[in-house]
Amino acid sequence: MKILVINVSLRPQSREKLFPIGLGYITTAMKNAGFVFDVLDIDAYRHSDQEVESFLRNNKYDIICIGCMVTGYKIVKTLSLLIKEFYPETIIIVGNSVATSIVNTLLTYTKVDIAVMGEGDETIVDLLETIHQGKPLDNVRGICFVKEGKMVSTAARPLIRDISKLPCIDFSIFDVDLYIQNSKISVSDPLPIPRDEVRALPVNTARGCVANCDFCYHVFKGVPYRYRTPGSIVGEIKSLIGKYSLNYINFWDELTLFSKKQNLELVQKILDDDLRFYWTGNCRANLFNSEDDIPIIEK
């Protein structure tokens, strides 16, 4: 099978080029399962609409996978129309929140064939293997598709409980040097080092959030908060620093720091392994509510 993975650009006018960490996990799972695929990284290279159209017209694929937030619905719709105009038989698979949150709209008003619901690491591999073997989709957990004019939702796929066992992202699937060079733009002020010296990549420490805020939606909303072990997190950081000479780590999670106990364990593991790096991460404002908590962060 000839497979293409597309990373869309939600903010083409922005100087920031943020590594697609969700798509990074998906493509890593695909690669580890033995699938060979191309990547069209529209966001990294800021390909124009004309360039994207030309690429899709001149390159035929059996399957095209698109990962996108719900705010990119219009982009996904446009891409699906283009793909089907050129190659009607190409199977279009879409994941992330644009699939999970508005699946009825997605499958009704676009040319998308299959929506991956929720966590996609295992689903995408199962789905691709099923398509490759010519088997019916009904037994693939965690997807929605249209069959004989009716929408079919398969059984939900169980959550990956121990996310520490997930393989770390293979950043080499994408243009990692481009993302590292651009990382200096996305790191927030105030900076502890000159901006031009920043070399950063993201690390995912958790999936989900302990809160259930009305204004927020993400793929892991409504499911248990899962946090990687300190050893797993630090092991990935150590590997990335050694491989890419990083001095900054972006903890890109819905919620990175959720308890003082967790924070102390992670800090201690970093100190035990003698790692030194700068970092950014997300936490609830009420987590650190006294001056006694500041030393945890300073460490």
Task: List each model region and its residues.
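Residue-level signal for short, function-critical loop segments
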Residues: S9-R11, V70, L255, A285
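Glycine- and acidic-residue-enriched helix-capping/strand-helix junction motifs
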Residues: P12-L23
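N-terminal [4Fe-4S]-dependent radical SAM core
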Residues: L4, S9-R11, V140, V146-P202
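A general structural detector for well-ordered alpha-helical segments in enzyme core domains, enriched
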Residues: I26, V52-F55, I75, L79-I83, ...
